[in-house]
Amino acid sequence: MASIIQALPTEVVYLITAGEVIDSLASVVRELVENSLDAGATRIVVSLWPQQWRIRVADNGCGMNLDDLQQAATAHSTSKIRSSADLWKINSLGFRGEALHSLTTLADLEILSRPVDGKLGWRISYGNGGKVVQVEVTAIAPGTVVTVSNLFGNCSSRRQGLPTTAQQMKAVQATIYQIALCHPHVTWQIWQNDRQWFTISPARTTGQLLPQILPQVRQGDLQEVKLEIPNPPHSPLPCTNAIHRVSPHSALTLVVGLPDRCHRHRPDWVRVAINGRMVKTPELEQTILSAFHRTLPRDRYPICFLHLAISPDQINWNRNPAKTEIYLNEIIYWQEQITQAINQALSISSSNLKEAVHTTRVSKLLKAAEAKGGYNFNPQNPKEDRKNPNSLKAVAQVSNTYIVAEHPGGMWLVEQHIAHERVLYEQLCDDWQLVPVEPPIILYQLSLAQVSQLQRIGLDIESFGEQLWAVRNIPAPLQQRDDCAEAILELSWGGDLQTAQVAVACRSAIRNGTPMNQQEMQTLLDNWQRTRNPRTCPHGRPIYLSLEESALARFFRRNWVIGKSHGI
């Protein structure tokens, strides 16, 4: 009996492989652009003709000589790795050697290239399977131009199964945005149907680039942190970052939207990149969301971009052809480092203190004042207190609600209740203490669910008669309050321990409308500045408003042209 299991023909194997790598216009752009970045390009031009299923990517990278061009589209040919050991030393975006060969299976491929030190450029057209069908000399600047035409022309069903043109262009734009965030030093020009679609200008840092991609976010709404962190144990290889510079440590770049200024309705801007590539890592994304917990309003999500440049032996890229999913070693170690970096970014210190005119109304006032005056504004650096450049000095209390504080760089307005709430909440998170009460607090007509909830958060509660319950210990901050029974009843309505801690902090914090003397205000300010997340309360409300010296000078037109203020 003949065997029913047979080896697949080579062309069928190639079609299967091509389908794994190239599945859309966006995947073509991704593969070609990554080749450009691996070639050291600092300027990339992407041209698209979606109705013609045609894509062109031009770059100013190192280029290829004739021998490399003739080999470029051969199956599994690459300049990135040589042996299986190199799979643990990958410092490039590509390494499989599949993309160009897959394109010859699914489309018409043409490459023009000239090496930086070469005098001649070459144009090569490839046939099915990566065979060279035409070679000629061409005039071209150093770099490479790859043109893909008639994509999926031999697979009409593939075209029919793809989304609409508008959706595909949206996917292309998202792909380029993701890559640009990982490589902020690159200039991008994107054309569609011979018209310029959008551009991305280079920036020194990702934080400076992000407002080009998210126009609704201002530069002042972001905080960027760059850290060198030790490599985890058992990581002998040096770290290589996205632009191929060897470093003895791993590097962490973090850009966060300050929670008192910007956030999202969806978790669509929690992004993680590793060694120059955006990846899907649910464990790290959840770490980011957890670090922002109790800093944002309800049902809101952070803006956060994390880029790790780590030793390649910590990563296994060989998980799927698109390389968007990885196996990451020592993941608990990286989660700890990320949490610490986010806490540092959200803290208030002299290094990250910025002008923070939070409301649109205040901004409009400043602009109006500036527009009406014919003065010359030259911002001056205020003299800072070198002993404690970030100190706040309580000056006064307004409406028994807001503390006016003087800062070396300007003036702050702090709401006393939510500042105290943040202090108490972090104290409760660090040390959830239950203290005995005598006599016990008697509660009436609790349901079994309410009793179970109080027991879940650690309270000692027992039946004290028909429809009566005795609570014999309570959270420490509540023991001095007259409304302790009401607070315990509120805790019984559900939620986890953290929800209970928020409720206790809110109940125990000083109420708005309460007079405070100078020493009490100063103590509160000192304690609040030492919290881990001083920008918002546990419910996500902003705690303070800052008016920096430069903003005040603008509003009061303090820097006039000489003689202007005297009518000369």
From Swiss-Prot:
<dbReference type="GO" id="GO:0006298">
    <property type="term" value="P:mismatch repair"/>
</dbReference>
<comment type="function">
    <text>This protein is involved in the repair of mismatches in DNA. It is required for dam-dependent methyl-directed DNA mismatch repair. May act as a 'molecular matchmaker', a protein that promotes the formation of a stable complex between two or more DNA-binding proteins in an ATP-dependent manner without itself being part of a final effector complex.</text>
</comment>
<dbReference type="GO" id="GO:0032300">
    <property type="term" value="C:mismatch repair complex"/>
</dbReference>
<dbReference type="GO" id="GO:0030983">
    <property type="term" value="F:mismatched DNA binding"/>
</dbReference>
<dbReference type="InterPro" id="IPR038973">
    <property type="entry name" value="MutL/Mlh/Pms-like"/>
</dbReference>
<dbReference type="InterPro" id="IPR013507">
    <property type="entry name" value="DNA_mismatch_S5_2-like"/>
</dbReference>
<dbReference type="InterPro" id="IPR020568">
    <property type="entry name" value="Ribosomal_Su5_D2-typ_SF"/>
</dbReference>
<dbReference type="InterPro" id="IPR042121">
    <property type="entry name" value="MutL_C_regsub"/>
</dbReference>
<dbReference type="Pfam" id="PF13589">
    <property type="entry name" value="HATPase_c_3"/>
</dbReference>
<keyword id="KW-0234">DNA repair</keyword>
<dbReference type="InterPro" id="IPR014790">
    <property type="entry name" value="MutL_C"/>
</dbReference>
<dbReference type="InterPro" id="IPR014721">
    <property type="entry name" value="Ribsml_uS5_D2-typ_fold_subgr"/>
</dbReference>
<dbReference type="InterPro" id="IPR020667">
    <property type="entry name" value="DNA_mismatch_repair_MutL"/>
</dbReference>
<dbReference type="GO" id="GO:0016887">
    <property type="term" value="F:ATP hydrolysis activity"/>
</dbReference>
<dbReference type="InterPro" id="IPR042120">
    <property type="entry name" value="MutL_C_dimsub"/>
</dbReference>
<dbReference type="InterPro" id="IPR036890">
    <property type="entry name" value="HATPase_C_sf"/>
</dbReference>
<dbReference type="GO" id="GO:0140664">
    <property type="term" value="F:ATP-dependent DNA damage sensor activity"/>
</dbReference>
<dbReference type="InterPro" id="IPR014762">
    <property type="entry name" value="DNA_mismatch_repair_CS"/>
</dbReference>
<dbReference type="Pfam" id="PF01119">
    <property type="entry name" value="DNA_mis_repair"/>
</dbReference>
<comment type="similarity">
    <text>Belongs to the DNA mismatch repair MutL/HexB family.</text>
</comment>
<keyword id="KW-0227">DNA damage</keyword>
<protein>
    <recommendedName>
        <fullName>DNA mismatch repair protein MutL</fullName>
    </recommendedName>
</protein>
<dbReference type="Pfam" id="PF08676">
    <property type="entry name" value="MutL_C"/>
</dbReference>
<dbReference type="InterPro" id="IPR037198">
    <property type="entry name" value="MutL_C_sf"/>
</dbReference>
<dbReference type="GO" id="GO:0005524">
    <property type="term" value="F:ATP binding"/>
</dbReference>
<dbReference type="InterPro" id="IPR002099">
    <property type="entry name" value="MutL/Mlh/PMS"/>
</dbReference>
